[in-house]
């Protein structure tokens, strides 16, 4: 293990992925993140109290370059040693060794991250849906609750036979399957409507791209409709994803519709076989228009 591990203050990496806790799911997670079809393979740092559980790269080439911080991910020192401030994403896996109290450790870890790096993108695995309300007071960006996902996928598979195969295809990283990608709105489409951008992307037939939704940031509100603020008094922003925005309607008060004007910071979600390059194609169509 020592041959691919070094002191965390020697890592010197940025824009990396931090995986908190090492579980049975970690192996597949690493292999998906470092799949040959992934164009931008980010460095991975694992924070775990059991580094001996992480395979050595001599056993599996996928693990070459994996860096390890021995410690509890809910400890701020462990997070700092892993370079939390310069990380692209933090993935918090439920510590399966803690069984029913695994979500409690996850909450403690998110609070620690909120305190020292509130702007980092955080994805958490939650085991019990009853614990979801506790995350309303954190800056977590994405919550994966296996309990809810399993129930909903089972129900949808009954209502729409075969739908599970669609999800399996989209969630498998390879050159032969479609994946979901997120792209920033090209500068020359800022101020234009989602519908105008959709038509331009549809015209890029040679790239085999399907536009499925819009991503934007909005102020997070509580159950009473009040804007939530952090401990500095700043509004808490949350990412919203609108799949297939509807036509503008008087009966709907949503601002995200087909005629919504795109702003800086918005993103589009696309389905494609590989990471698409829409910038060049859209620039050509924009110039012609």
Q: What is the role of each PLM region?
A:
Residues 1-289:
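Cytosolic regulatory regions of ion transport systems
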């Amino acid at each position: 293990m020592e041959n691919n591990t070094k002191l965390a203050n020697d890592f010197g990496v940025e824009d990396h992925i931090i995986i908190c806790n090492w579980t049975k799911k970690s192996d597949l997670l690493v292999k998906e993140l470092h799949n040959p079809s992934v164009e931008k393979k980010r460095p991975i740092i694992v924070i775990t109290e059991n580094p001996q559980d992480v395979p050595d790269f001599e056993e599996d080439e996928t693990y070459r370059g994996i860096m390890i911080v021995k410690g509890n991910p809910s400890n701020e020192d462990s997070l700092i040693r892993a370079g939390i401030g310069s990380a692209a994403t933090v993935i918090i896996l439920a510590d399966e060794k803690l069984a029913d109290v695994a979500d409690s450790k996850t909450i403690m870890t998110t609070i620690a991250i909120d305190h020292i790096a509130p702007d980092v993108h955080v994805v958490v695995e939650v085991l019990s849906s009853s614990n979801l309300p506790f995350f309303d007071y954190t800056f977590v960006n994405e919550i994966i609750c296996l309990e809810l996902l399993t129930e909903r996928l089972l129900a949808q598979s009954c209502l729409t036979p075969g739908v599970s195969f669609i999800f399996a295809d989209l969630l498998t990283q390879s050159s032969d399957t479609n994946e979901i990608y997120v792209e920033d709105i090209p500068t020359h489409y800022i101020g234009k409507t989602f519908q105008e951008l959709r038509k331009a992307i549809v015209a890029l037939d040679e790239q085999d791209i399907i536009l499925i939704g819009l991503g934007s940031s909005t102020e997070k509100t509580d159950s009473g409709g009040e804007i939530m603020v952090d401990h500095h008094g700043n509004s808490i922003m949350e990412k919203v994803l609108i799949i297939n925005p509807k036509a503008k309607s008087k009966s709907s008060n949503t601002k995200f519709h087909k005629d919504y004007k795109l702003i800086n910071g918005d993103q589009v979600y696309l389905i494609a076989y590989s990471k698409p390059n829409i910038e060049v194609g859209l620039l050509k169509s924009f110039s012609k228009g």
